[in-house]
Every structure is written in structure tokens, then in C-alpha cells.
């Protein structure tokens, strides 16, 4: 018996038998998910808080465009964008030394005391507390002291004053916030009033944190504290006199005295009057 091969012809060139059935089943599954409420919901875009419906709430500019600006050759010479972000206050005050002056003071004192930076940190702590108690007057001299447990250690005050430009008080204003926090810490343990406040007879214990002469008044200083600090400063400066010139020690008599005196004269500045002596 001769075996003959059967030849099968397909209508399409792609063999996808049964694939249409799988696609139909998958389509029914998706339809079922939509009907069961599991369809993916596309959210609407967020609505800006400044809008209500189709109306937009206007925003005001920080600086109006109608300002009279410094002009040269018809062009403004100020940058308003930079000015809006430039909000420095403390470091611009003439009441405190500049960063360069403070650095020069620090380096000069460290060189004069022949100390390392780690030791200088301890020295500055002690000097700040000493200034809280004794002030930063330019008339102070001698030594300043620091306690090591029960031992009192003295340091010459001259390097602190010599390197302080423009003044020691302006240098110490860099320590104003730290000194205020130190007084507040001491007051939590027990009532503490700096010597500056005791001399001015400050009786309100809550104002002790402002009772030192290098306190830096800022915009956040309470009105009552500001008044108390200025009153203490006025009391400290009430009887102080500042003389521009001292006594000139180079004083000589440039006039020659040619007056002749005898033993019968009444006194050194008066001759006798026909033998009559004054009473």
C-alpha cells in the first residue's frame, strides 16, 4: 500500500491557532473588572488654592513698581530681586566689631597669652563671665580672674584691651547671646543677678538676663527689657566725665623775673612803703 502525505493549506500566513480565543477571554475579564468597580480612575489636576472656579485671586508684589529708584542715564542702579532676599541686621550694626576686627582680637590675644585654640576656648568662657560681672569699661586695668574649682587664676588684662579695636565692648557684643543664655542657665539653679544689675539696684529678677553692659539690643528685645537696660546704662554714665586733654606736664616759665627785692620789703611781691609794713 502506498502511503501518501496529506498537505494542509492555511488561510493566513501566521500560526495563531487558539490565540483569538485567549484574547476574547482577556477582554471579558477586563469588562468584568470595569463592571465590578475596579476600573482605574484618572484624577483631575489639582486646583490652586488661590482660585475659585474660573476667577483668580490677584497677588500683590512685595515691592511696587511705582517706587522712585535711584536712576543714572535712565536706568535703575538697584537690583530689587537681590534686595528682597537681603535681610541682614545684626552683622551690620556699628555697635559690634566686624568679623575681621574680632578675628584680629582673637589672634592677638592668643599670641600674647601663648595659648593653643583648645585652651583659648576655656579662656574666652572665663573672660565672658568676668565681663558679665565687672563690665567692659575702657578704664578697667590690672588683671582679670578665672576660677579653677577653688583656685583663683589671674591673667593680665592688657592684651585683652590692647587688641580690642574699636573697643572691648564692641568686641564682647559677639558674646551677647551666649552671655544671656548663661545668665538664664544660672537663674534656673538659683536666683542670680550680675553685679551690673546689683549696682543699679535692679529688683526684677526676670530682667537679670539683660543686666550686663555689652548686651546687644535687637528688634526682638522686649520693650520692658529695653527700657530697663537703657536706664541702667544712663545710671552708669550719669557722673562720668570724659576730658579730651589731660594736664600738660611740659609747662615751663618763659618770662624772666627782673624784680629786685630787699630784706625790708613787705613780702615777695610788695616793696616797703616808707618803712610802713602791711598788716
UniProtKB/Swiss-Prot annotation:
A Pfam family recorded for this sequence: Poty_coat
Site positions for Cleavage: 11-12
Post-translational modification: Genome polyprotein of potyviruses undergoes post-translational proteolytic processing by the main proteinase NIa-pro resulting in the production of at least ten individual proteins. The P1 proteinase and the HC-pro cleave only their respective C-termini autocatalytically. 6K1 is essential for proper proteolytic separation of P3 from CI.
EC numbers, comma separated: 2.7.7.48
GO cellular component term, pick one: viral capsid
Catalyzed reactions: RNA(n) + a ribonucleoside 5'-triphosphate = RNA(n+1) + diphosphate
A GO term, aspect molecular function: RNA-directed RNA polymerase activity
Keyword line: Capsid protein, Nucleotidyltransferase, RNA-directed RNA polymerase, Transferase, Virion
Enzyme class, broadest EC rank: transferase
Lineage top rank: taxon: Viruses
The keyword Lipid biosynthesis is annotated on this UniProt entry: no
Annotated family: Belongs to the potyviridae genome polyprotein family.
Protein known as: Genome polyprotein
